[in-house]
Amino acid sequence: MSKLITIERHILEQQKNFPEATGELTDLLSDVAFAAKLVRREVVRAGLVDILGFAGSTNVQGEEVKKLDLFANDKIINAIGQHGRFAIMGSEENEEIITPPNNENGSYALLFDPLDGSSNIDVNVSVGTIFSIYKIKNSDPRKADISDCLQKGSEQVAAGYVIYGSSVVMVYTTGNGVHGFTYDPTIGEFLLSHENIVTPKHGKYYSINEGSYAQFNDTTKKYLDYIKEEDSATGRPYSTRYIGSLVADFHRNLLTGGVFVYPPTTNHPNGKLRLMYEGNPLAYICEQAGGRATDGRRRILDIDPSELHQRTPLYIGSEDDVRVAEEFEQGIR
């Protein structure tokens, strides 16, 4: 019988690979796992309680906020911020940075999207939480500010996501491989189910919202025409798989191989996805699993951010597939 390894135990085991570790990051990841359990509890009950529908407000992105978005955001801030282990936090739902109480001993910054894909929750499609952790630059946690959040993705010390679907899965990396855990509701624990995830170098799926085809530039249209052509030597045509929930589309492609593309459009020439809350954490995970992530021209993790809610195009997934998409975007093909 295989051993049952909880996420907390696995994090502690991973800590042994770093003799200089203080255990603080281990506690932070455990806090994130706990917050995910709280969000999961409400997501699975969403149709039974008054938590569906819109809250009657818009977020900093100009999007209508759903009640469950606000619930998830508040739960994560309260569950994680109360321990004082984070000096500063940033949420996709909050315009400004968040300073947790009792943060004088915090050494890290947390950036998160509390409920990615929440527009799908009413129709029982998978949604998720995405998070990113950085070491703050400021020597005094009480003086931590937005500059501690605006770091390149390559500076991340941990990143992960939780997908709430037919099962609840948490995936994380601390720069030493990618590991996945499935939630067992009978014991209330995340158990190791996907150790050392490695994404295929070449896949057969592509994920893109083709409903925006008229807004795509010519290079994106040429790319789509290319991957639909018959060519057994290159494994074409690809099959499309698009849920409309980034974390769900990314998770599937991470395991099975493929590419997720959210290119520039006429409505969003700088891209639509958020660099700090979606691009960076997923790029870190993808690279740790052997994949590739760019904005079509630059490595996502090398982008120097200038805004907390900065947007970016995103090409992410299997290395070979992302390179092909890049070549079209750059006009090489």
UniProtKB/Swiss-Prot annotation:
Cofactor(s) the protein needs: Mg(2+)
Enzyme class of the recorded protein, top EC level: hydrolase
Cellular component GO terms, alphabetical: cytosol
Binding site for substrate: D116, G117, S118, S119, N209, Y242, K272
Domain of life: Bacteria
GO molecular function, one term: fructose 1,6-bisphosphate 1-phosphatase activity
Biological process per Gene Ontology, one example term: fructose 6-phosphate metabolic process
Known EC number: 3.1.3.11
Cofactor note: Binds 2 magnesium ions per subunit.
Keyword Acetylation: no
Nucleotidyltransferase among keywords: no
Metabolic or biological pathway: Carbohydrate biosynthesis; Calvin cycle
Positions contributing to Mg(2+) 2 binding: D113, D116, E278
Family that this chain belongs to: Belongs to the FBPase class 1 family.
Subunit structure: Homotetramer.
Protein name listed in UniProt: Fructose-1,6-bisphosphatase class 1
Organism: Chlorobium phaeovibrioides (strain DSM 265 / 1930) (Prosthecochloris vibrioformis (strain DSM 265))
Gene behind this protein: fbp
